[in-house]
């Protein structure tokens, strides 16, 4: 898909992977709307991109519906969706204080998996009805999983389950939307340098980078964004989860 002039939605676009994707979309000429809970950062990124920001809770149907409608009123109906909203708390099944907190497990599943599903289904209602472009393509949906979906570590039961769910629903959604001209792909990042990782001590970040086979460093958010752009531009990519991890296979802990 040629992104120039196309409307795009990026959830979690106020920082990290989402912000990098939003910036690269804007550089390609897309009209970007950021949906995020962080108003200060979201407004800042949107202003930088001459885009649009909407405060949005991806787990709430009304919030997402209103966010998509607001973005449509400003930029027209979007053909591009990049789902980056998510959280990543770690906890053991049985820790020092007893069993894994059930509320924490539910929250991670709700934000990461159900939130992605919620935005995707509501986005698709209008996008599947747009006029087709080249190859009868109407839109592209990109979701964000994690290598934890495949080799989760101790303490990642909830996170791995949430990201594994995103991976598992990629193909069924792509198959459903095939006759409507909407492609669906998922990116499964490894250890990328994001604000969440920046809070770790420098020596820990260095050690993490050295654990990557090649290139032996942390990944960059811009590399995630670059892969997202390739997915958008390559019309034969569909129904696939792509690992972006420098050949990393995570150890148990």
Residue ranges and their predicted role:
Residues 88-106, 125, 129-135, 155-158, ...:
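Conserved mid-core segment of classical short-chain dehydrogenase/reductases
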Residues 146:
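Residue(s) in the substrate-gating loop at a strand-loop-helix junction
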Residues 220-244, 249:
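C-terminal substrate-recognition "lid" of short-chain dehydrogenase/reductases
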Residues 125, 174-176:
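Alpha-helical segment proximal to the catalytic Tyr-Lys
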Residues 87, 98-118, 142, 159, ...:
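Catalytic Tyr-X3-Lys loop
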